[in-house]
Amino acid sequence: MGLPTVPGLLLSLVLLALLMGIHPSGVTGLVPSLGDREKRDSLCPQGKYVHSKNNSICCTKCHKGTYLVSDCPSPGRDTVCRECEKGTFTASQNYLRQCLSCKTCRKEMSQVEISPCQADKDTVCGCKENQFQRYLSETHFQCVDCSPCFNGTVTIPCKETQNTVCNCHAGFFLRESECVPCSHCKKNEECMKLCLPPPLANVTNPQDSGTAVLLPLVILLGLCLLSFIFISLMCRYPRWRPEVYSIICRDPVPVKEEKAGKPLTPAPSPAFSPTSGFNPTLGFSTPGFSSPVSSTPISPIFGPSNWHFMPPVSEVVPTQGADPLLYESLCSVPAPTSVQKWEDSAHPQRPDNADLAILYAVVDGVPPARWKEFMRFMGLSEHEIERLEMQNGRCLREAQYSMLEAWRRRTPRHEDTLEVVGLVLSKMNLAGCLENILEALRNPAPSSTTRLPR
């Protein structure tokens, strides 16, 4: 048995075979392609197009702002173009038969006109300040106010086509670029993840670990700061705690503090007796400067037969020269005294009172304006100068004597006082002061009253 035949089926198959055998160019010729126009333009160089009726002719395109009226009649001839009328435009070279209509900014979309339509460009529409463009389609947009980020902070500011990006504070969540209170959050919404507080353990542990690290550091820094302030005050004001001062500052206790328990008037030294030639409590004036150290002769009163002119340091008794209470009357009420001198036969060696007279003569011989400079040359530190000044703030003369006495205690015993003083005064261009000092030691001028301190 053969296959059943359907009337007309054979004829349809034959026609289909004939169509498949036809060349593809013939098929495409039946349906014009969308890119025909571009293919035709590609046959001509840039800036020209194919004549609409003669494919062998390439005509020049019309400039922007114009449109095509008629093609060029022949190669090398100009195309006939005409300028666009008001309300129309062409934004590039073209061979359009008519210009494009200008668009209008839509007020219902809150659009504003940025620049008007011209023959060579379309109208430019935009938004007002603090607005952005929300596109409803590829060409249509609506102007929307930028979010002010209330109850939050601005992460990314508002741009031309993008709203503000906000970071909401605690207790708020982000909904359509606005921070909304968590009280408006309903169950089974995405905001529940943002509004629910984190687990208690996650919050507590970091705080505990941070506190455990920071608290000891804060306590340690506080103790260091208090210790520094305490040491600074003790070194600055040593009268407060003399024992602590001597331990911390590694400096001997100030002389006044050491001798505070002694009587106001110390007993006279066995090597010293009142005479009419010398009084250690008196100051000696220094009228001027004249000669160096070596050129000044020594008076017989202070010669080697009477006392050691420059005794060793170990023979100096600090209590005789350093205690400012002995000379407190010089800073308060003038008291008449008699002139004293040495006795040769009873006491052959009197180094303590001799140094006392020399130191007071130096105090009176150096100008007060250059006293600190003098003591720096003698080797006293700035700290010690200030300390002795504060201890003897009531009397400048006693402060100067305390500085000299402190220097004398630390001077090697083989160095004598006047020789060192003379060298220092020479460096300071005050060598003449030594002559005045020696003159005061040779001839102490008797007076009825003690000279007031400077």
Curated annotation (Swiss-Prot):
It is found in: Cell membrane; Golgi apparatus membrane. (Microbial infection) Glycosylated at Arg-376 by S.typhimurium protein Ssek3: arginine GlcNAcylation prevents homotypic/heterotypic death domain interactions. Residues 30-212 are extracellular. It holds the Pfam family TNFR_c6. Residues 1-29 form the signal peptide. One of its GO terms (cellular component) is membrane raft. TNFR-Cys repeats lie at residues 43-82, 83-125, 126-166, 167-196. GO terms for molecular function: signaling receptor activity; tumor necrosis factor binding; tumor necrosis factor receptor activity. Glycans are attached at residues 54, 151, 202, 376. Residues 339-349 are annotated as: N-SMase activation domain (NSD). The keyword Signal applies. GO terms for biological process: aortic valve development; cell surface receptor signaling pathway; cell surface receptor signaling pathway via JAK-STAT; cellular response to mechanical stimulus; cytokine-mediated signaling pathway; defense response; defense response to bacterium; extrinsic apoptotic signaling pathway via death domain receptors. It comes from the Eukaryota. Keywords: Apoptosis, Cell membrane, Disulfide bond, Glycoprotein, Golgi apparatus, Membrane, Receptor, Repeat, Signal, Transmembrane, Transmembrane helix. Residues 356-441 form the Death domain. Gene3D superfamilies: Death Domain, Fas (1.10.533.10), Tumor Necrosis Factor Receptor, subunit A, domain 2 (2.10.50.10). It is a single-pass type I membrane protein. Disulfide bonds join 44-58, 59-72, 62-81, 84-99, 102-117, 105-125, 127-143, 146-158, 149-166, 168-179, 182-195, 185-191. The chain crosses the membrane at residues 213-235. Both the cytoplasmic membrane-proximal region and the C-terminal region containing the death domain are involved in the interaction with TRPC4AP. Binding of TNF to the extracellular domain leads to homotrimerization. The aggregated death domains provide a novel molecular interface that interacts specifically with the death domain of TRADD. Various TRADD-interacting proteins such as TRAFS, RIPK1 and possibly FADD, are recruited to the complex by their association with TRADD. This complex activates at least two distinct signaling cascades, apoptosis and NF-kappa-B signaling. Interacts with BAG4, BABAM2, FEM1B, GRB2, SQSTM1 and TRPC4AP. Interacts with DAB2IP. Interacts directly with NOL3 (via CARD domain); inhibits TNF-signaling pathway. Receptor for TNFSF2/TNF-alpha and homotrimeric TNFSF1/lymphotoxin-alpha. The adapter molecule FADD recruits caspase-8 to the activated receptor. The resulting death-inducing signaling complex (DISC) performs caspase-8 proteolytic activation which initiates the subsequent cascade of caspases (aspartate-specific cysteine proteases) mediating apoptosis. This is Tumor necrosis factor receptor superfamily member 1A. It comes from Mus musculus. The lineage of its organism: Eukaryota, Metazoa, Chordata, Craniata, Vertebrata. The gene is Tnfrsf1a.
